[in-house]
Design a protein with these regions (language model features):
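Feature marks short, surface-exposed loop/turn motifs that line or immediately flank catalytic pockets
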Residues: 75, 145, 163-165, 184-188
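Bacterial N-terminal signal peptides
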Residues: 21-31
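Bacterial N-terminal signal peptides that target proteins for export
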Residues: 3-21
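Short secondary-structure boundary motifs at beta->alpha junctions and helix caps
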Residues: 91-98, 168-204
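A structural "domain/chain start" motif
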Residues: 33-104
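Extracytoplasmic/secreted envelope proteins and their assembly/folding machinery
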Residues: 104, 108-112, 199-202, 206
Length: 207
């Protein structure tokens, strides 16, 4: 019996099929390797400043409107990172915990909410509202971080606040200007404990 002899065309076809099979298998193994080496996803916990509103006092309401400018913040703290420092040079943040909002906006919103709650003014407008007011409140956050040292862990806030009369001109516009430095010890050593301590510190400045 005569055995069939492979032609060059048939041989080339078999080689092509074998190459395609190897390429397909390579992609499968590569995909499996990438999937196996992928880093696991972590949930990011987000925190807000929060404190009890002061009691109302509408009996002494003043016929004036207050407008909040957007508070500024030092570049080092201008993010949602929950920053901690152990000296004048160190600078770090929690890996899986963040502020839900930029600290400058959280502080301004909290102070504005307190002023509305008191009911002492005809109206209090936030930075997002288009309405204006005669008296304009501006602020600047200079430091906002968790200090960690031998004495323990402390929430630290350093900021300045000013109030201007938009009707006046020159130096007469500035009615009030003050710098605040508030520190509050943590009662719980955790990002949540830091958020609570920072809230108490901000509350003392606001009130």
């Amino acid at each position: 019996m005569q055995h069939p002899v492979s032609t060059p065309a048939l041989f080339a076809k078999k080689c092509k099929y074998a190459c395609l099979t190897l390429i397909a298998l390579s992609f499968v193994f590569l995909a499996a390797g990438c999937a196996g080496s992928a880093k696991p996803a972590y949930n990011i916990e987000r925190y807000l400043l929060s404190w009890p509103s002061p009691p109302g006092d509408e009996a002494r309401r003043l016929p004036v409107c207050i407008k909040f400018n957007r508070f500024s913040i030092a570049a080092a703290y201008n993010s949602t990172d929950m920053i901690f420092r152990d000296d004048d040079y160190g600078f770090d943040s929690f890996n899986y915990s963040r502020w839900a909002v930029n600290p400058a906006d959280m502080i301004a919103d909290g102070i504005a909410a307190d002023m509305r709650s008191v009911g002492k003014y005809q109206a209090v407008f936030s930075r997002q509202e288009t309405a204006g007011g005669r008296f304009v409140i501006s602020g600047g956050i200079e430091e906002f971080y968790l200090r960690t040292d031998k004495s323990g862990k402390t929430a630290l806030i350093s900021m300045s606040v000013s109030v201007e009369d938009s009707v006046e001109k020159g130096t007469a516009r500035i009615l009030f200007q003050k710098k605040y430095l508030q520190e509050e010890r943590l009662q719980e050593t955790s990002p949540r404990g830091y958020a609570r301590a920072a809230s108490r510190a901000t509350q003392k400045i606001a009130h």
